[in-house]
Design a protein with these regions (language model features):
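Amphipathic, Lys/Arg-enriched alpha-helical patches that create a basic surface
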Residues: 170-179, 201-214
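Short non-catalytic regulatory patches outside canonical folded cores
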Residues: 20-30, 47, 51-52, 60-178, ...
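A short secondary-structure junction motif
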Residues: 15, 72, 183, 187-191
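C-terminal/domain-terminus segments
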Residues: 159, 163, 188-211
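Active-site-adjacent bridging/hinge elements
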Residues: 35-43, 197-199
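N-terminal, Lys/Arg-enriched amphipathic/low-complexity engagement segments
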Residues: 1-35
Length: 214
């Protein structure tokens, strides 16, 4: 777990130095390394659960790690594909400071208005602005904010992600998704009893959890 923690710690450092910015009706917003730092803390808690033989809790937190990472990838892809000024519109501006400022102002005004934004962009902004939880936004949650929805969006809108899923992750995703759901919903008494296993099974449970985490 420590080695995996270091990977996410490095990712957090990288994402804090690679900030993605966009604009909405409530002003500018950005995506940085917040999710990666949160995942690092969750991994520390998973490590503690394993130390205390609380594997049912560890798998529940492992599900949280998976969901948080998928949500981050969803939000990142939406921001990277924001619908502001088109390439054709940008080409009409000349390369001088005054023209560049006008181009930036037009791009920001289009983003703030939201007139070209997709439903995914508008829903993502509600998440950024911390208003997604409100009852009037329940359809956005239903349509976009679920791990299966994140996966569907990413596979449909990012060719690299689609290639990775189709060629390397299909079987593992189905297998591990089923396992994590079983622990979260306690689909059998053994998923509850894994919170107090016998010591002679600890090594096997550690190995199994690491394989799922990887």
């Amino acid at each position: 777990i420590e080695n995996i923690w270091y990977i996410f710690f490095c990712l957090a450092d990288s994402t804090f130095s690679s900030v993605y910015v966009s604009y909405g009706k409530k002003g500018p917003y950005m995506l940085s390394g917040e999710t990666m730092m949160s995942i690092c803390k969750t991994l520390e808690t998973i490590d503690f659960c394993c130390y205390r033989d609380a594997y049912s809790d560890a798998y529940n937190l492992l599900r949280k790690c998976r969901d948080d990472l998928m949500q981050y990838l969803f939000v990142l892809n939406v921001i990277q594909n924001k619908h502001g000024l088109t390439d054709e519109e940008a080409e009409k501006f000349t390369i001088n400071s005054e023209s560049m400022m006008k181009m930036i102002e037009l791009d920001v005004s289009i983003l703030v208005s939201g007139e070209r934004k997709t439903d995914a962009e508008l829903a993502m902004e509600k998440w950024i602005y911390n208003v997604l939880e409100r009852s009037e936004n329940k359809e956005d949650i239903k349509k976009f904010f679920d791990t299966s929805k994140y996966k569907s969006y990413l596979v449909s809108n990012n060719e690299k992600v689609k290639y990775i899923f189709d060629n390397f992750l299909v079987d593992k995703w189905l297998r591990e998704d089923r396992k994590l759901n079983n622990y979260v919903h306690a689909n059998g008494i053994r998923f509850v009893m894994d919170n107090y296993i016998y010591q002679n099974k600890k090594e096997d449970k550690d190995k199994e959890l690491i394989e799922t985490l990887q």
